[in-house]
Amino acid sequence: MQEVFAGVMQRRLKENRRENDVLQVFMDAIYKDGTKLPPHEVTGLMICLLFAGQHTSSVTSTWTGLYLLQDKGKVLKELVEEQKRHAKVDHDSIKDMPLLHAAVSEALRLQPPLIFLMREVLEDREYKGMTLPKGDKIFLSPTLAGRRADVFTNPNEYDPYRFLAPREEQRKFSHGWLGFGGGRHRCIGENFAYMQIKTIWAYLLRNFELEMEGGLPQPNYEALVVGPHHHQCFVKYKRRAAPL
């Protein structure tokens, strides 16, 4: 893969050609000291971008479905009705699925794929009586942040409606929800991830009747990306006589 990206870069430089894409952004990037990113760093960043959302998106898509199916109630029925309002699945219709969007957000709140986020202290700070010295690392827990009772009502319960108006509990204070991190290093693939996961579940809901066998599986905290224990996930499916 390094060779593929390196080859594309070399052709662009040889032909003095520019493109409107993320590779060009990295090729043009400059450090504070004025130096450009060396080719091996550009190819490394491209490979990271390619794989960064692979496991997190698939795991979040899985949790989204598992919570929907174990709920067996109002949410799933309303999601089916939401799909019926759209003649087809395309970019515009995917953007107009607020309940499905909220269902993905709720799955991320309850089961974020990353155990922690890490930041470096850039200057000495005092916080609630503690001294945070420059150079120290701070670890943030999206799981704990998503289950704070002062932010989310009944935080251990599955309730996608908390993300919809008028409640919008995630807006109670800045960074009240860390599904995609925050600050200048917030996940740049957030919009794509939502589009991807919502597309998957739009097609599944429109074409299949789904039912979970057994209860909600336990998260596997031994994995780099926290997904459900795969041997506990059983779902029955039946193709609809006619798609929604």
Each PLM stretch: what is its role?
Residues 140-168:
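Conserved cytochrome P450 K-helix/beta-meander segment immediately N-terminal to the heme-binding cysteine loop
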Residues 1-61, 97, 163:
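Conserved cytochrome P450 catalytic core segment spanning the I/J/K helices
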Residues 56-80, 190-206:
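Cytochrome P450 catalytic-core helices
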Residues 84-86, 185-186, 190-244:
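Cytochrome P450 proximal C-terminal region
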Residues 3, 7, 89-128, 149:
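Conserved cytochrome P450 K-helix E-x-x-R motif and the immediately C-terminal K′/meander segment
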